Structure formats: C-alpha cells, structure tokens
C-alpha cells in the first residue's frame, strides 16, 4: 500500500487526537491507527452530514405528488410505498381514504374529478404550481407550493369551492373584496399569504358543503401546514412583526370558521386565538387613527394612502375578529383579547369602570379609532362611504339604519358591556349606593339594546324577515338573547327596593316580548338552508337552553306559558336540523332535546 507523508497540515488524525498520541500524519493511515487497526480519519475527510432541515419533508412531498400524478394517469397503479416517518403517515392516510360519496358528474366519477391532475405543461395558474426544482430551497414560496401540490384538486373543483365560499360563507364572514382577491390570485407568483388565503377560502367552503365534506379535514390540514410554514419563516426574521399581511389574518379567521363548524369544542378556538394575536401585533384596531402601519400586497403604506376597498377590508377583518372574540366567550367568563378600549368604544357611563367601585371617579377618555363596516354594495363596488364611529352608533341620538354586519358589530359591543355588567355584580356589594350604580348601568344597556331591536323590527305580516342573509338572521336572533341576558343579570342582584322590584318586573315583560321575537326568527329559520346559517347561531341557541334551564324566566309568568312552549319547540327544531352540519349544535344531547319537548306537551 502506498503511503505518503502529508506535510501540508499539522493536524493529527481523529484517533490520535482522541487518544492524545503523536501522529506521524502518514496517509491514508498513520502508524498508530495501523497498529491498532482503527479507522484513520484526518480533518477535512469527515463524512458529509445528513440532509438539511426540511429536505426530507420536501422530498416526501414531491414523492406524494408524483404518486398522485401516476394514480391519475393509470387507475390500476397502486401506491404501495409507506413512509416510516410518523409525520408523513397522517397525510398519506388521508390521501388514500378520501373517497367522496357523491357521484353526480357523468361519465367520470367524483374521485377522478377531484384528484385529476393536469399534465406538466398545463398546471393551473391559481396557486397549484409544481414544486421548486431546488430540493433544499427553504423559502416559504417553495415550501407552500409543495404543500399545495400534496392535495391536487382539479381546476373545476377549485373554482366550485371558491364560488361556494362567496355563495354560502361570505355572508357570515364578509371580509373579502372579490375584485381585489381575483387580482391578487391572478398574479404569476402570488405572495405566500395570498396562497394561504386561497386555501382557507376552500377549507371554509368545504364546511358548508355536503359534496366536499369528505375532503374538508384534508384541506384544513393543508391550510394549517401552510400557515405554520409562513409563520415559522417570519419568526426567523427580526423585522417579521412589522410585515403582517392582511391576507394572513384573514386566513386564520376563515380557518376559525371551519374549526367552529367541524372541530371539537377544545379545538374550536385555536385559529381564532392566532388571528387575535396577529391583530394585536399589527395594531389593526388603530386603523382609523392614521397611525397603523400594515403591509398589504407587495408594498407597505400608511393607512391614509390606501384606497377605500383596502381600508374597508382591513376594518372588516378587525371587526370579524372582534365578533369572534365575543362569540367564543358567550358561555365562558373569559377576558376579551380585544377589549372595548382597543376599538375606542367609550361606555356611556363611568359606572362601567371597575375602579369606580374602589372610590375612583374617573371617566373613560378614549380616542375613537375605528369606524363600523360600510354596506355590502359600497364595499364590493369600492364606493367611498364615511361610516360613523362605534361610539356614534351607540349614541342615543343616532337612529340611522346600518348594514347587517355593522349591526352585528354594535350588538357584539353591547354584549361585551352586558358581560362586564354581570361581572361587576360579583365585585360590588349590596349597599344602596352600589344598587343605584347597578340600575343606572342596567337602564342604559336596556335602552341601547331596545334601540337596536326597534331598528331591526319588521312588520308582523312579513313571512321571512331576513330574506336570504344569514348575518341579518343572526342579528335578529341575538337582540332578544341580549335582553334575556340582562334579565338574568337583574335576577342575580340581591338588593332591591320596591321601585326596583317594579322595574325588574318590567324587564321580565320585555323578556317575554323578546322571546316572541326570537320565536318568530326561529320559525323563519326552518325555511332557511342549513348550509347558509351563521356559524355561531347554534352557539347562541345552546346559550338559550342554558338560560331556560337555570332561570326559567320566560316560564315564570302563567300568561307566557303558551308562547314559551312555542319558543322552545321552535328552538328544538332548528337545533335538530343543524346537528349534522354544525358541531356546536351537538352540545345539547338528544335526550335533553326530547325531554324539553316532552315537558311542554
């Protein structure tokens, strides 16, 4: 064996360095290693390390894509390769088990329709692009592209899902400007946040469809993976917190719609929490204060420089997050992630301040920062409309009618006040001074809610009071629910004068009227498509059953017994119709629903 003495380096081999011996540096094996029959490795000759982080995952994604392409071209081809990695097992299982039950397209089957993949020269230009040839590239563009490719939907299914979103989901989550969305998606290389938004739109649409119900969970996992990848890349950049795109927040909110519709209660608030954190990080609540800096599209501008459509889309995104924050806590005494102080809502009375009960006599002095959403026509047609601030909407002198979404925002703000009002009951004592403050707050809230009820009131002869608008139906149902919430709070107060007891009786009469209004809405819902019902309507219905079971305020008046029975029957029928569509409708067991109907016979 030829040996050479390497005089170019003074470094010993690894074995001699480990044993702290003098090395003669003879190649390919030094004398010490030859005697001990050890492997002689010099610095610079070390074996190359394994693949970099992300390379194996990208390789698996490419293999899955190739397998699906082969399966689409040859129906007899069988995917038999099984990854041992546990992280890849779940997506493979989903890719093999998705078999839609509906077969409405002839002669091709639904399976061929959904998983048909175009040839390499005719990939659709709407985000379904091939993987980057550079396997080790770790930019979020290539990573999200690989995510999209692992679930290959045909162009027809993609278009159908997006149309379903605007037909069924948009009315409950009106945050997308359709023309701007189409423009963003027609870009040759859309931004990662825009790609995530498109996935989230398809995922939320699947929750409102019987045809695509089977692929909803798969779409959810794909969207979640894309958003996680986007955020993991942002966290590596010190300037990432300043470049939150509005499409990023919208993606989490639409994913929250799917979670609330399909996921268990323990998982139903995950996406909403992520969206709320992003809203806080980018200070989206300061939008109308002209000091919010947020990236939109491919450039960053101040809020005053943007056109109405972009500004309105941001407002709507914030208000939807605000509504979700309130609605997720209708049954839990949790703190708000977006308190009223953030949106600039000033309570009409200093009695809402907990500090007031500690002897402080200060008024809220908040800068009004946010305007309520404009009408749908103004938003979609980009017609600049100067909407009032939330505090102006809540004012006593403002009786202007608002869009259903703006009305929903006002009701959510009122619900936050009602929840704070109830929490202060446990803080305050039972003295006469505290009782006066309690009833002052109570009267102000009841007046504000009654004003919203009057604005929404429809003629008695109207057979369908909300047409085909799920947001309008939800607001019609939520107003009487707020009245019942206040009546329940009044029932919790222990110290009452004779005058206050009389006022309390008046509120109970208002609760009876509210129950009649809610019965009317519920009976109209029976003619409403279950796939167009607001995602949080079943949650409010469940809250009604909690109220009825604990207090039975509606049933306490003998004259209201007949109306109460009609009310509960209508609620029961609506919940029964929604149990197969909305997860929250299943929170009341079947035996409880049956028992309610039996007791009212």
From Swiss-Prot:
Q: Which PROSITE patterns match?
A: ZN2_CY6_FUNGAL_1 (PS00463), ZN2_CY6_FUNGAL_2 (PS50048)
Q: Which UniProt keywords apply?
A: DNA-binding, Metal-binding, Nucleus, Transcription, Transcription regulation, Virulence, Zinc
- One of this protein's GO BP terms? DNA-templated transcription
Gene3D superfamilies on file: Zn(2)-C6 fungal-type DNA-binding domain
Stimuli inducing this protein: Expression is induced during the early biotrophic stage of development.
**Annotated transmembrane regions:** none
Record-linked CDD domains: fungal_TF_MHR (cd12148), GAL4 (cd00067)
The entry lists its GO molecular-function terms as: DNA binding; DNA-binding transcription factor activity, RNA polymerase II-specific; zinc ion binding
InterPro entries tied to this protein:
TF_fung (IPR050815), Transcription_factor_dom_fun (IPR007219), Zn2-C6_fun-type_DNA-bd_sf (IPR036864), Zn2Cys6_DnaBD (IPR001138)
Predominant localisation class: nucleus
- Annotated localization: Nucleus
Q: Name one GO cellular component term.
A: nucleus
Specify the DNA-binding region ranges: 13-40
Cited PANTHER family = C6 FINGER DOMAIN TRANSCRIPTION FACTOR DBAA-RELATED (PTHR47338:SF3), ZN(II)2CYS6 TRANSCRIPTION FACTOR (EUROFUNG)-RELATED (PTHR47338)
> What is the role of the protein in this entry?
Transcription factor that regulates the expression of the gene cluster that mediates the biosynthesis of abscisic acid (ABA), a phytohormone that acts antagonistically toward salicylic acid (SA), jasmonic acid (JA) and ethylene (ETH) signaling, to impede plant defense responses.
Name the record gives this protein: Abscisic acid cluster transcription factor abl7
Q: Which gene encodes it?
A: abl7
């Amino acid at each position: 064996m030829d040996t050479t003495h390497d005089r170019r380096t003074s470094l010993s081999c690894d074995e001699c360095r480990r044993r702290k011996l003098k090395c003669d540096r003879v190649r390919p094996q030094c004398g010490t290693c030859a005697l001990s029959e050890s492997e002689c490795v010099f610095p610079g000759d070390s074996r190359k390390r394994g693949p970099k982080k992300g390379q194996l995952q990208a390789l698996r994604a490419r293999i899955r894509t190739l397998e699906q392409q082969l399966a689409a071209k040859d129906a007899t081809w069988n995917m038999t390769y099984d990854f041992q990695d546990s992280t890849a097992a779940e997506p493979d299982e989903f890719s093999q088990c998705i078999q839609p039950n509906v077969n409405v397209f002839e002669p091709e089957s639904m399976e061929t329709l959904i998983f048909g993949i175009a040839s390499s020269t005719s990939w659709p230009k709407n985000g379904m692009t091939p993987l980057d040839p550079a396997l080790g590239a770790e930019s979020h563009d290539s990573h999200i592209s690989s995510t999209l490719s692992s679930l290959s939907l045909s162009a027809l299914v993609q278009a159908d899902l997006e149309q379903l979103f605007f037909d069924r989901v948009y009315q409950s989550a009106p945050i997308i400007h359709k023309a701007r969305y189409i423009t963003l998606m027609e870009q040759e290389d859309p931004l990662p946040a825009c790609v995530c938004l498109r996935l989230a739109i398809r995922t939320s649409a699947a929750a409102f469809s019987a045809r695509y119900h089977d692929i909803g969970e798969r779409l959810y996992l794909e969207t979640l993976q894309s958003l996680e990848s986007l955020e993991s890349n942002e966290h590596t950049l010190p300037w990432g917190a300043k470049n939150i795109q509005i499409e990023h927040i919208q993606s989490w909110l639409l994913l929250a719609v799917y979670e609330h519709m399909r996921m268990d209660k323990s998982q139903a608030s995950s996406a909403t929490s992520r969206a709320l954190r992003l809203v806080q990080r980018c200070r989206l609540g300061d939008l109308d204060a002209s000091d919010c800096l947020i990236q939109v599209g491919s450039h960053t501008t101040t809020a005053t420089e943007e056109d109405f459509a972009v500004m309105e889309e941001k407002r709507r995104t914030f208000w939807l997050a605000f509504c979700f924050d309130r609605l997720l806590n209708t049954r839990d005494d949790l703190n708000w992630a977006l308190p009223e102080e953030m949106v600039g809502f000033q309570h009409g009375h200093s009695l809402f301040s907990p500090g007031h009960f500690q002897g402080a006599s200060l008024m809220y002095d908040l800068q009004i920062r946010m305007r309520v959403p404009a009408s749908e026509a103004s938003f979609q047609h980009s017609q600049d409309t100067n909407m009032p601030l939330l505090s102006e909407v809540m004012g006593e002198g403002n009786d202007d009618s608002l869009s259903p979404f703006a009305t929903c925002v006002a009701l959510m703000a009122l619900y936050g006040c009602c929840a704070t009002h109830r929490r202060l009951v446990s803080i305050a004592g039972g003295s006469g001074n505290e009782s006066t403050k309690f009833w002052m707050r109570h009267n102000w809230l009841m007046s504000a809610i009654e004003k919203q009820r009057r604005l929404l009131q429809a003629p008695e002869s109207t057979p369908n009071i909300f047409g085909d608008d799920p947001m309008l139906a939800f607001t019609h149902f939520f107003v009487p629910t707020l009245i019942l919430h206040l009546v329940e709070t009044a029932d919790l107060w222990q110290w009452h004068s004779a005058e206050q007891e009389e006022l309390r009786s008046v509120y109970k009469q208002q609760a009876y009227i509210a129950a009649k209004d809610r019965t009317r809405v519920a009976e109209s819902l029976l003619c409403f498509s279950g796939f167009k019902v607001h995602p949080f309507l079943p949650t409010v219905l469940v809250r009604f059953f909690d109220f009825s079971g604990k207090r039975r305020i509606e049933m306490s008046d003998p004259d209201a017994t007949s109306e109460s029975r009609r009310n509960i029957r209508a609620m029961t029928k609506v919940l029964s119709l929604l149990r197969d569509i909305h997860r929250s409708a299943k929170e009341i067991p079947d035996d409880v629903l049956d028992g309610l109907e039996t007791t009212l016979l």
